């Protein structure tokens, strides 16, 4: 996790948790001169649009006061959704047995994109089976990971 994301996580997660939600993850996407700060929240009985609005208002106040982002940005508060992103080893461990799509920051064994069965977590690695090959992907190399929803 980059130091900017760690700083934002440390600032925003306590606010989200104080409101009774779980901070599922944070993404900060630079898009030219304007950036996007996307905050995913969750709770046991699911997230409604009103929940996102409540959290967004509180986070906006904190961000205005603390001013951790020097450039222009848009704050977006969202539920993780069906194709939920995975940020932590704990989240990967909770979704063992599901199909995942993973993009790496840099190539690993000659590739950056992996789509397959999430087999487990070993120390700091995520274990993914693609076809008949098992890959141990270092968590620090993962740029983006999502569950692939099943519609059975």
From Swiss-Prot:
The keyword Cytoplasm applies. SUPFAM superfamilies: YhbC-like, C-terminal domain, YhbC-like, N-terminal domain. Disulfide bonds: none annotated. GO terms for cellular component: cytosol. Keywords: Cytoplasm, Ribosome biogenesis. It holds the Pfam family RimP_N. One of its GO terms (biological process) is ribosomal small subunit assembly. It is found in: Cytoplasm. The keyword Cell membrane does not apply. Its main location: cytoplasm. Signal peptide: none annotated. HAMAP family: RimP (MF_01077). Belongs to the RimP family. Required for maturation of 30S ribosomal subunits. This is Ribosome maturation factor RimP. It comes from Ectopseudomonas mendocina (strain ymp) (Pseudomonas mendocina). The gene is rimP.
């Amino acid at each position: 996790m980059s130091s900017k994301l760690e700083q934002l996580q440390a600032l925003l997660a306590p606010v989200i948790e104080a409101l009774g939600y779980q901070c599922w993850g944070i993404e900060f996407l630079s898009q030219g001169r304007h950036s996007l700060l996307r905050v995913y929240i969750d709770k046991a009985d699911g997230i409604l649009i009103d929940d996102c609005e409540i959290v967004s208002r509180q986070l906006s106040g904190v961000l205005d006061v603390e001013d951790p982002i020097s450039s222009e940005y848009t704050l977006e508060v969202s539920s993780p959704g069906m194709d939920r992103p995975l940020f932590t080893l704990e989240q990967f461990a909770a979704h063992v047995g599901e199909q995942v799509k993973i993009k790496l920051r840099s190539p690993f064994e000659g590739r950056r994109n992996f789509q397959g069965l999430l087999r487990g977590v070993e120390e700091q690695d995520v274990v993914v089976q693609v076809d008949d090959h098992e890959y141990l992907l270092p968590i620090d190399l993962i740029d983006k990971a999502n569950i692939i929803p099943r519609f059975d």
